[in-house]
């Protein structure tokens, strides 16, 4: 979002909680406040997707070995639909957050979810480079020190827990 805001073009950021942990929500809000203070063409809105997701879950019949994974990925797809609604309604593009390790190294994204974007400004950067860029851009410390997580499971598992390796290990392998 900061790279998009630095273009000087209009930027709309969306907070889309789905049973989100309070620390994740507060970090997001802190970042939105920082963006608004530093980039006048940035605006923010919140769309609480929890009720929509809960209705979706209630309509699904539990079954199959991948039921929990299917529900987790449904969160990413619901967010993608919301991003594209707001993008089209406002004449804006959807920018992604995927990096070289996640999108091209190990495929750690949800097809038609967080992988469904119009542009990927950090797609060519390793995760460690993303953090270095974030430090250079003055991103708030609470985000820099947070363990990366997709927030799709409703628990405290991190990206590295799910991947079974650290980002530096994955970068070394790549």
Briefly describe each language-model feature range.
Residues 93, 97-165:
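Catalytic subdomain that performs nucleotidyl-dependent activation
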Residues 1-105:
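ATP-dependent adenylation/nucleotidyltransferase module used to activate substrates
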Residues 59-64, 159-167:
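Short, charged low-complexity intrinsically disordered segments located at boundaries
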Residues 169-174:
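Short alpha-helical "packing" element that flanks the helix-turn-helix/winged-helix DNA-binding module
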Residues 23-26, 78-81, 125-129, 164, ...:
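Conserved active-site and cofactor/substrate-binding residues in soluble primary-metabolism enzymes
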């Amino acid at each position: 979002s900061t790279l998009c805001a630095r273009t000087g073009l209009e930027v709309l950021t969306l907070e889309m909680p789905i049973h989100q942990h309070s620390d994740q929500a507060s970090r997001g809000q802190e970042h939105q406040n920082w963006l608004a203070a530093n980039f006048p063409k940035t605006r923010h809105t919140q769309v609480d997707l929890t009720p929509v997701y809960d209705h979706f879950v209630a309509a699904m019949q539990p079954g199959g070995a991948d039921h929990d994974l299917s529900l987790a990925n449904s969160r990413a797809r619901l967010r993608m639909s919301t991003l594209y609604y707001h993008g089209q309604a406002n004449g804006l593009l959807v920018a992604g957050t995927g990096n070289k390790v996640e999108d091209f190294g190990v495929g750690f994204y949800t097809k038609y979810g967080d992988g469904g974007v119009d542009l990927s400004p950090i797609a060519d950067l390793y995760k460690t480079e993303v953090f270095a860029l974030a430090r250079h851009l003055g991103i708030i410390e609470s985000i820099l020190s947070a363990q990366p997580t997709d927030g799709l499971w409703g628990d405290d598992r991190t990206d590295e827990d799910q991947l079974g390796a650290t980002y530096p290990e994955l970068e070394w392998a790549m």
